[in-house]
């Protein structure tokens, strides 16, 4: 400093009192710097902990997997798409696509049923599909007009097309929801195959035949009152559409005054029971309702008949209802129930889920199921889901003489015996 003519005494004249007692008056106190970041650190820490807690749930699910491949062995479509169930989890976590056609998965829960660790693979398929903007490719949806109609009615401007709670005749604490197969014109979906012969609404008509025989007052919650339950939209990955349908239906069901909601459609039943929050309302499948209310009409088949029963994936593996439908059928005098090779929790899927991927691969699964039906020697193949009936009927309408057995919903089968008893 001597070289530039400055000494300590001269420099001291330029000093300024520093409230933080630091030599540099322009520097921030360390406490002030820390205080500026407290909100960021606090909020960031909370967000981090929340995200981490969510992540650990998925991480835990991933780490449960042994890598034993039992899930792949159980998967009905594995041979068609060479998919790896373990990759579904990891690719969901990493938001990656391994090239496996995720829409070919039937979400039938056969993999989770086989898993020794009970990993819920279907939930990961659900998440992956929800990440796809715009929903599934049109090539995966055989009935695009049908899906467009159901998606359009989810919008608020369509609310006025449905009857209000105040104007709808509800005179019972029990409500019955028919599902979309009863609402949609049968010509709209299957006319090119069956020339309009399939009666998709028979399960509903038959259900009320049984309710009347049991002297049970049940209110019909038709599709002029409630919208589609949203099952197909949810499992196609159209979460926004599903949430709109759910919000509308949930509000009206809660306001209807019923305490029990019954449906013959396994998909509708599962959706209301698992994906809706219906406080104080018991959701039941029609067969479950009949069993719990002591359905016993001393029915007798007109002729001895051999039947077999197909477990719907949504009703069986996902809702664990296996015995009820069988008990109702075997209670009919003159009926012999013969099980197929794959039945109960090991039952094969009908090959179509959420109205997606109705193709040669799914057809092969139905052919396999029909071979099992023929092996039982059954005259009638029974099930408890109108959608399963419709998918199996599609194959039967091809006219193969080997498929000479009848396909019926359990509810329709029971109603037939009731009508025969009345005419006897």
Question: Where are the regions that the model predicts?
Answer:
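Cofactor-cradling patches in redox/metallo enzymes
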Residues: 185-202, 206-285, 316-330, 335-424
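C-terminal amphipathic alpha-helical segment
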Residues: 293-332
């Amino acid at each position: 400093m001597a070289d530039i003519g400055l000494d300590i005494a001269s420099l001291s004249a330029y000093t300024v009192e520093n409230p933080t007692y630091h030599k540099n008056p322009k520097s921030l106190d360390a406490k002030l710097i820390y205080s500026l970041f407290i909100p960021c650190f606090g909020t960031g820490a909370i967000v981090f902990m929340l995200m981490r807690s969510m992540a650990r749930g998925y991480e835990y699910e991933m780490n449960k997997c042994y890598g034993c491949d039992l899930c792949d062995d159980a998967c009905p479509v594995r041979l068609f798409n060479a998919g790896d169930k373990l990759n579904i989890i990891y690719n969901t976590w990493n938001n990656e696509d391994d090239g496996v056609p995720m829409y070919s998965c039937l979400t039938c829960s056969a993999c989770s049923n086989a898993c020794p660790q009970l990993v819920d693979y279907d939930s990961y398929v659900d998440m992956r599909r929800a990440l796809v903007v715009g929903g599934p490719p049109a090539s995966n949806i055989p009935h695009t007009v049908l899906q467009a109609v159901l998606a359009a009615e989810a919008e608020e401007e369509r609310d006025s097309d449905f009857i209000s709670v105040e104007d709808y005749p509800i005179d019972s604490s029990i409500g019955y929801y028919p599902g979309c197969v009863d609402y949609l014109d049968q010509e709209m979906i299957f006319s090119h195959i069956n020339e309009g012969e399939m009666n998709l609404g028979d399960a509903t008509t038959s259900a009320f035949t049984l309710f009347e025989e049991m002297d049970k007052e049940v209110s019909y919650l038709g599709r002029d009152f409630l919208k589609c339950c949203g099952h197909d939209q949810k499992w196609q990955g159209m979460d926004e559409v599903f949430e709109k349908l759910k919000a509308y239906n949930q509000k009206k069901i809660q306001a209807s005054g019923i305490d029990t909601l019954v449906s013959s459609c396994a998909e509708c039943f599962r959706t209301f029971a698992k994906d809706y929050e219906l406080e104080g309302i018991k959701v039941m499948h029609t067969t479950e309702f009949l069993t719990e209310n002591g359905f016993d009409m001393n029915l007798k088949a007109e002729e001895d008949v051999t039947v077999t029963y197909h477990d719907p994936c949504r009703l069986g593996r996902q809702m664990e209802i296996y015995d009820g439908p069988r008990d109702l059928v075997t209670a009919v005098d003159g009926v012999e129930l013969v099980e197929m090779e794959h039945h109960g929790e090991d039952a094969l899927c009908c090959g179509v889920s959420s109205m997606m991927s109705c193709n040669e691969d799914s057809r092969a699964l139905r052919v396999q199921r029909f071979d099992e039906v023929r092996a039982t020697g059954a005259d009638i193949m029974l099930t408890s889901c109108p959608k399963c009936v419709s998918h199996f009927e599609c194959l039967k309408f091809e006219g193969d003489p080997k498929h000479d057995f009848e396909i019926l919903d359990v509810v329709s089968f029971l109603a037939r015996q009731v009508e025969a008893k009345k005419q006897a």
